[in-house]
Amino acid sequence: MQENQQITKKEQYNLNKLQKRLRRNVGEAIADFNMIEEGDRIMVCLSGGKDSYTMLEILRNLQQSAPINFSLVAVNLDQKQPGFPEHVLPEYLEKLGVEYKIVEENTYGIVKEKIPEGKTTCSLCSRLRRGILYRTATELGATKIALGHHRDDILQTLFLNMFYGGKMKGMPPKLMSDDGKHIVIRPLAYCREKDIQRFADAKAFPIIPCNLCGSQPNLQRQVIADMLRDWDKRYPGRIETMFSAMQNVVPSHLCDTNLFDFKGITHGSEVVNGGDLAFDREEIPLQPAGWQPEEDENQLDELRLNVVEVK
Protein backbone atom coordinates (compact mmCIF):
# COMPACT_ATOMS: atom_id res chain seq x y z
CA MET A 1 0.00 0.00 0.00
CA GLN A 2 2.79 2.39 0.93
CA GLU A 3 4.61 1.57 -2.32
CA ASN A 4 1.47 2.39 -4.34
CA GLN A 5 1.16 5.73 -2.53
CA GLN A 6 4.79 6.51 -3.36
CA ILE A 7 4.20 5.76 -7.04
CA THR A 8 1.15 8.03 -7.02
CA LYS A 9 3.13 10.87 -5.47
CA LYS A 10 5.84 10.41 -8.08
CA GLU A 11 3.29 10.52 -10.89
CA GLN A 12 1.77 13.67 -9.45
CA TYR A 13 5.18 15.27 -9.06
CA ASN A 14 6.15 14.48 -12.65
CA LEU A 15 2.87 15.77 -14.03
CA ASN A 16 3.30 18.98 -12.06
CA LYS A 17 6.72 19.49 -13.65
CA LEU A 18 5.30 18.84 -17.10
CA GLN A 19 2.35 21.17 -16.62
CA LYS A 20 4.61 23.88 -15.21
CA ARG A 21 6.80 23.64 -18.30
CA LEU A 22 3.79 23.95 -20.60
CA ARG A 23 2.51 26.88 -18.55
CA ARG A 24 5.89 28.55 -18.77
CA ASN A 25 6.11 27.98 -22.54
CA VAL A 26 2.62 29.36 -23.13
CA GLY A 27 3.19 32.28 -20.77
CA GLU A 28 6.41 33.24 -22.54
CA ALA A 29 4.77 33.07 -25.97
CA ILE A 30 1.87 35.21 -24.77
CA ALA A 31 4.29 37.79 -23.37
CA ASP A 32 6.72 37.80 -26.32
CA PHE A 33 3.98 38.38 -28.90
CA ASN A 34 1.45 40.26 -26.75
CA MET A 35 -1.13 37.60 -27.57
CA ILE A 36 -3.61 38.35 -24.80
CA GLU A 37 -4.59 41.78 -23.47
CA GLU A 38 -6.85 43.13 -20.76
CA GLY A 39 -10.51 42.36 -21.46
CA ASP A 40 -9.84 39.98 -24.34
CA ARG A 41 -12.45 37.39 -25.22
CA ILE A 42 -10.51 34.41 -26.57
CA MET A 43 -12.24 31.99 -28.92
CA VAL A 44 -10.44 28.68 -28.32
CA CYS A 45 -10.81 26.47 -31.39
CA LEU A 46 -11.36 22.97 -30.03
CA SER A 47 -11.05 20.11 -32.52
CA GLY A 48 -11.03 17.27 -30.01
CA GLY A 49 -7.34 16.53 -30.56
CA LYS A 50 -4.54 16.54 -27.99
CA ASP A 51 -3.26 19.99 -28.99
CA SER A 52 -6.50 21.93 -28.62
CA TYR A 53 -7.40 20.14 -25.37
CA THR A 54 -4.00 21.05 -23.94
CA MET A 55 -4.32 24.65 -25.12
CA LEU A 56 -7.69 25.04 -23.41
CA GLU A 57 -6.42 23.43 -20.20
CA ILE A 58 -3.31 25.62 -19.97
CA LEU A 59 -5.20 28.82 -20.82
CA ARG A 60 -7.78 28.01 -18.13
CA ASN A 61 -4.97 27.43 -15.68
CA LEU A 62 -3.20 30.68 -16.56
CA GLN A 63 -6.48 32.56 -16.39
CA GLN A 64 -6.63 31.91 -12.64
CA SER A 65 -3.33 33.64 -11.91
CA ALA A 66 -2.91 36.10 -14.78
CA PRO A 67 -2.43 39.79 -13.87
CA ILE A 68 -5.04 40.71 -16.49
CA ASN A 69 -8.65 39.68 -17.00
CA PHE A 70 -9.68 37.72 -20.07
CA SER A 71 -12.45 35.27 -20.88
CA LEU A 72 -12.52 32.02 -22.85
CA VAL A 73 -15.14 30.50 -25.09
CA ALA A 74 -14.50 27.10 -26.65
CA VAL A 75 -15.76 26.54 -30.20
CA ASN A 76 -15.99 23.29 -32.10
CA LEU A 77 -17.03 22.93 -35.72
CA ASP A 78 -19.14 19.83 -36.29
CA GLN A 79 -18.57 19.23 -40.01
CA LYS A 80 -21.02 16.31 -40.15
CA GLN A 81 -18.38 13.73 -40.84
CA PRO A 82 -19.65 10.15 -40.57
CA GLY A 83 -19.04 8.74 -37.13
CA PHE A 84 -18.35 12.07 -35.43
CA PRO A 85 -19.17 11.59 -31.71
CA GLU A 86 -21.38 14.63 -31.15
CA HIS A 87 -21.73 14.05 -27.40
CA VAL A 88 -18.04 14.03 -26.46
CA LEU A 89 -17.16 17.72 -26.46
CA PRO A 90 -20.43 19.06 -24.94
CA GLU A 91 -20.17 16.57 -22.08
CA TYR A 92 -16.52 17.41 -21.48
CA LEU A 93 -17.00 21.18 -21.58
CA GLU A 94 -20.12 21.15 -19.43
CA LYS A 95 -18.25 19.14 -16.83
CA LEU A 96 -15.51 21.78 -16.82
CA GLY A 97 -18.00 24.62 -16.69
CA VAL A 98 -16.48 26.24 -19.77
CA GLU A 99 -18.59 28.45 -22.04
CA TYR A 100 -18.79 26.81 -25.44
CA LYS A 101 -20.51 26.77 -28.81
CA ILE A 102 -20.86 23.85 -31.22
CA VAL A 103 -21.19 25.11 -34.79
CA GLU A 104 -22.91 22.64 -37.11
CA GLU A 105 -22.03 23.03 -40.80
CA ASN A 106 -22.08 20.22 -43.37
CA THR A 107 -18.72 21.09 -44.91
CA TYR A 108 -18.08 17.36 -45.29
CA GLY A 109 -20.93 17.14 -47.81
CA ILE A 110 -19.67 20.18 -49.73
CA VAL A 111 -16.14 18.81 -49.96
CA LYS A 112 -17.35 15.38 -51.11
CA GLU A 113 -19.43 17.04 -53.80
CA LYS A 114 -16.65 19.32 -55.08
CA ILE A 115 -13.54 17.12 -54.81
CA PRO A 116 -13.18 14.01 -57.03
CA GLU A 117 -12.77 10.67 -55.27
CA GLY A 118 -9.17 9.96 -54.35
CA LYS A 119 -8.08 13.62 -54.40
CA THR A 120 -7.00 15.39 -51.22
CA THR A 121 -9.79 17.34 -49.56
CA CYS A 122 -7.69 19.24 -47.01
CA SER A 123 -7.28 22.52 -48.91
CA LEU A 124 -10.99 23.15 -49.58
CA CYS A 125 -11.97 21.86 -46.15
CA SER A 126 -9.48 24.23 -44.52
CA ARG A 127 -10.83 27.26 -46.41
CA LEU A 128 -14.42 26.43 -45.52
CA ARG A 129 -13.53 25.83 -41.89
CA ARG A 130 -11.56 29.07 -41.67
CA GLY A 131 -14.43 31.14 -43.01
CA ILE A 132 -16.91 29.59 -40.58
CA LEU A 133 -14.61 30.18 -37.62
CA TYR A 134 -14.10 33.83 -38.60
CA ARG A 135 -17.85 34.31 -38.83
CA THR A 136 -18.37 32.60 -35.48
CA ALA A 137 -15.73 34.80 -33.83
CA THR A 138 -17.65 37.86 -34.97
CA GLU A 139 -20.95 36.46 -33.70
CA LEU A 140 -19.43 35.68 -30.30
CA GLY A 141 -17.69 39.04 -29.98
CA ALA A 142 -14.29 37.34 -29.72
CA THR A 143 -11.26 39.63 -29.87
CA LYS A 144 -8.75 36.82 -30.50
CA ILE A 145 -8.91 33.39 -32.15
CA ALA A 146 -6.64 30.79 -30.52
CA LEU A 147 -5.35 27.86 -32.58
CA GLY A 148 -3.51 24.83 -31.20
CA HIS A 149 -0.41 24.70 -33.42
CA HIS A 150 2.79 23.96 -31.51
CA ARG A 151 6.53 24.37 -32.05
CA ASP A 152 6.83 21.20 -34.15
CA ASP A 153 4.02 22.38 -36.47
CA ILE A 154 5.84 25.68 -36.97
CA LEU A 155 9.14 24.01 -37.83
CA GLN A 156 7.45 21.52 -40.14
CA THR A 157 5.82 24.39 -42.03
CA LEU A 158 9.18 26.16 -42.35
CA PHE A 159 10.81 23.10 -43.90
CA LEU A 160 7.80 22.36 -46.12
CA ASN A 161 8.05 25.85 -47.58
CA MET A 162 11.83 25.58 -47.97
CA PHE A 163 11.82 22.12 -49.56
CA TYR A 164 8.71 22.39 -51.72
CA GLY A 165 7.81 26.08 -51.93
CA GLY A 166 11.19 27.74 -52.37
CA LYS A 167 10.64 30.27 -49.59
CA MET A 168 11.57 30.75 -45.96
CA LYS A 169 8.13 31.01 -44.44
CA GLY A 170 6.87 29.41 -41.27
CA MET A 171 3.73 29.70 -39.19
CA PRO A 172 3.54 32.95 -37.18
CA PRO A 173 2.58 32.85 -33.49
CA LYS A 174 0.34 35.87 -34.09
CA LEU A 175 -1.19 37.28 -37.26
CA MET A 176 -4.09 39.17 -38.76
CA SER A 177 -6.74 36.89 -40.24
CA ASP A 178 -7.35 36.58 -43.98
CA ASP A 179 -10.40 38.83 -43.78
CA GLY A 180 -8.48 41.51 -41.88
CA LYS A 181 -10.96 41.51 -39.00
CA HIS A 182 -9.52 39.09 -36.46
CA ILE A 183 -6.25 38.49 -34.63
CA VAL A 184 -5.19 34.84 -34.64
CA ILE A 185 -2.87 33.57 -31.91
CA ARG A 186 -1.00 30.32 -31.33
CA PRO A 187 -0.36 30.07 -27.58
CA LEU A 188 1.40 26.69 -27.93
CA ALA A 189 4.06 28.13 -30.27
CA TYR A 190 6.88 27.38 -27.80
CA CYS A 191 5.55 23.96 -26.70
CA ARG A 192 7.06 20.66 -27.80
CA GLU A 193 4.69 18.12 -29.29
CA LYS A 194 6.09 15.34 -27.12
CA ASP A 195 5.28 17.36 -23.99
CA ILE A 196 1.74 17.91 -25.25
CA GLN A 197 1.35 14.20 -26.01
CA ARG A 198 2.50 13.18 -22.53
CA PHE A 199 0.22 15.76 -20.93
CA ALA A 200 -2.78 14.62 -22.97
CA ASP A 201 -2.09 10.98 -22.10
CA ALA A 202 -1.83 11.77 -18.41
CA LYS A 203 -5.01 13.84 -18.40
CA ALA A 204 -6.86 11.21 -20.46
CA PHE A 205 -8.57 13.77 -22.67
CA PRO A 206 -11.47 12.28 -24.69
CA ILE A 207 -9.63 12.40 -28.02
CA ILE A 208 -11.69 12.51 -31.21
CA PRO A 209 -9.96 10.90 -34.25
CA CYS A 210 -8.80 13.38 -36.87
CA ASN A 211 -9.33 11.09 -39.88
CA LEU A 212 -13.11 10.72 -39.79
CA CYS A 213 -13.35 12.39 -43.19
CA GLY A 214 -11.32 9.57 -44.72
CA SER A 215 -8.66 11.96 -46.01
CA GLN A 216 -5.10 10.67 -46.10
CA PRO A 217 -2.45 12.53 -44.10
CA ASN A 218 -0.28 15.03 -45.98
CA LEU A 219 2.58 12.83 -47.18
CA GLN A 220 5.04 15.70 -47.55
CA ARG A 221 4.35 16.98 -44.03
CA GLN A 222 4.67 13.45 -42.66
CA VAL A 223 8.11 13.09 -44.27
CA ILE A 224 9.21 16.36 -42.67
CA ALA A 225 7.77 15.34 -39.29
CA ASP A 226 9.63 12.02 -39.41
CA MET A 227 12.85 13.83 -40.33
CA LEU A 228 12.55 16.23 -37.38
CA ARG A 229 11.76 13.42 -34.96
CA ASP A 230 14.83 11.52 -36.17
CA TRP A 231 17.01 14.60 -35.70
CA ASP A 232 15.60 15.14 -32.24
CA LYS A 233 16.61 11.61 -31.23
CA ARG A 234 20.04 11.57 -32.86
CA TYR A 235 21.11 15.17 -32.27
CA PRO A 236 19.80 16.52 -28.94
CA GLY A 237 19.27 20.25 -29.09
CA ARG A 238 19.05 20.56 -32.88
CA ILE A 239 15.30 21.26 -32.84
CA GLU A 240 15.71 23.94 -30.17
CA THR A 241 18.52 25.55 -32.17
CA MET A 242 16.49 25.62 -35.38
CA PHE A 243 13.55 27.21 -33.59
CA SER A 244 15.90 29.79 -32.03
CA ALA A 245 17.15 30.57 -35.55
CA MET A 246 13.61 31.55 -36.56
CA GLN A 247 13.79 34.24 -33.87
CA ASN A 248 17.27 35.41 -34.84
CA VAL A 249 17.10 36.26 -38.54
CA VAL A 250 19.92 38.31 -40.12
CA PRO A 251 18.53 39.71 -43.43
CA SER A 252 21.89 41.23 -44.44
CA HIS A 253 23.38 37.73 -44.58
CA LEU A 254 20.68 36.16 -46.72
CA CYS A 255 19.74 36.90 -50.35
CA ASP A 256 16.34 38.61 -50.22
CA THR A 257 16.60 42.06 -51.79
CA ASN A 258 13.18 42.93 -50.38
CA LEU A 259 14.50 42.56 -46.83
CA PHE A 260 17.89 44.20 -47.28
CA ASP A 261 19.20 46.88 -49.64
CA PHE A 262 22.17 45.08 -51.16
CA LYS A 263 22.26 47.49 -54.11
CA GLY A 264 22.72 50.33 -51.66
CA ILE A 265 26.05 48.97 -50.42
CA THR A 266 28.83 51.16 -51.82
CA HIS A 267 32.34 52.22 -50.85
CA GLY A 268 32.05 53.98 -47.54
CA SER A 269 29.00 52.01 -46.37
CA GLU A 270 28.92 50.90 -42.75
CA VAL A 271 29.77 47.33 -41.78
CA VAL A 272 26.53 45.46 -41.10
CA ASN A 273 26.29 42.56 -38.65
CA GLY A 274 30.01 41.82 -38.65
CA GLY A 275 30.53 42.15 -42.38
CA ASP A 276 31.82 39.18 -44.38
CA LEU A 277 32.94 36.31 -42.19
CA ALA A 278 33.09 33.82 -45.05
CA PHE A 279 36.86 33.40 -44.69
CA ASP A 280 36.73 33.03 -40.91
CA ARG A 281 36.33 29.74 -39.14
CA GLU A 282 32.89 29.52 -37.60
CA GLU A 283 32.89 29.29 -33.82
CA ILE A 284 30.40 26.52 -33.10
CA PRO A 285 29.42 25.95 -29.46
CA LEU A 286 29.90 22.49 -28.04
CA GLN A 287 26.19 22.31 -27.30
CA PRO A 288 23.47 23.71 -29.59
CA ALA A 289 21.98 27.08 -28.70
CA GLY A 290 18.79 26.73 -26.72
CA TRP A 291 19.58 23.15 -25.67
CA GLN A 292 18.64 22.08 -22.18
CA PRO A 293 19.19 18.67 -20.54
CA GLU A 294 16.25 16.38 -21.20
CA GLU A 295 14.32 15.37 -18.12
CA ASP A 296 14.11 11.70 -17.28
CA GLU A 297 11.98 10.28 -20.11
CA ASN A 298 11.03 7.25 -18.02
CA GLN A 299 9.72 9.44 -15.22
CA LEU A 300 7.59 11.49 -17.58
CA ASP A 301 6.22 8.35 -19.22
CA GLU A 302 4.95 7.16 -15.83
CA LEU A 303 2.28 9.87 -15.74
CA ARG A 304 -1.20 8.45 -15.28
CA LEU A 305 -4.60 9.63 -14.16
CA ASN A 306 -3.68 10.51 -10.58
CA VAL A 307 -3.01 14.21 -11.08
CA VAL A 308 -2.97 17.41 -9.10
CA GLU A 309 -3.61 20.75 -10.68
CA VAL A 310 -0.87 23.36 -10.80
CA LYS A 311 -2.27 26.64 -9.59
UniProtKB/Swiss-Prot annotation:
Pfam families: ATP_bind_3 (PF01171). Gene3D superfamilies: HUPs. It is an enzyme of class 2 (transferase). It is found in: Cytoplasm. Its EC number is 2.8.1.-. The keyword Repeat does not apply. GO terms for molecular function: 4 iron, 4 sulfur cluster binding; ATP binding; magnesium ion binding; sulfurtransferase activity; tRNA binding. Keywords: 4Fe-4S, ATP-binding, Cytoplasm, Iron, Iron-sulfur, Magnesium, Metal-binding, Nucleotide-binding, RNA-binding, Transferase, tRNA processing, tRNA-binding. GO terms for cellular component: cytoplasm. GO terms for biological process: tRNA thio-modification. Its cofactor is Mg(2+); [4Fe-4S] cluster. SUPFAM superfamilies: Adenine nucleotide alpha hydrolases-like (SSF52402). A motif (PP-loop motif) lies at residues 47-52. [4Fe-4S] cluster binds at C122, C125, C213. Pathway: tRNA modification. Disulfide bonds: none annotated. Binds 1 [4Fe-4S] cluster per subunit. The cluster is chelated by three Cys residues, the fourth Fe has a free coordination site that may bind a sulfur atom transferred from the persulfide of IscS. It catalyses: cytidine(32) in tRNA + S-sulfanyl-L-cysteinyl-[cysteine desulfurase] + AH2 + ATP = 2-thiocytidine(32) in tRNA + L-cysteinyl-[cysteine desulfurase] + A + AMP + diphosphate + H(+). Belongs to the TtcA family. The thiolation reaction likely consists of two steps: a first activation step by ATP to form an adenylated intermediate of the target base of tRNA, and a second nucleophilic substitution step of the sulfur (S) atom supplied by the hydrosulfide attached to the Fe-S cluster. Catalyzes the ATP-dependent 2-thiolation of cytidine in position 32 of tRNA, to form 2-thiocytidine (s(2)C32). The sulfur atoms are provided by the cysteine/cysteine desulfurase (IscS) system. NCBIfam families: PRK10696.1. Homodimer. This is tRNA-cytidine(32) 2-sulfurtransferase. It comes from Shigella sonnei (strain Ss046). The lineage of its organism: Bacteria, Pseudomonadati, Pseudomonadota, Gammaproteobacteria, Enterobacterales.
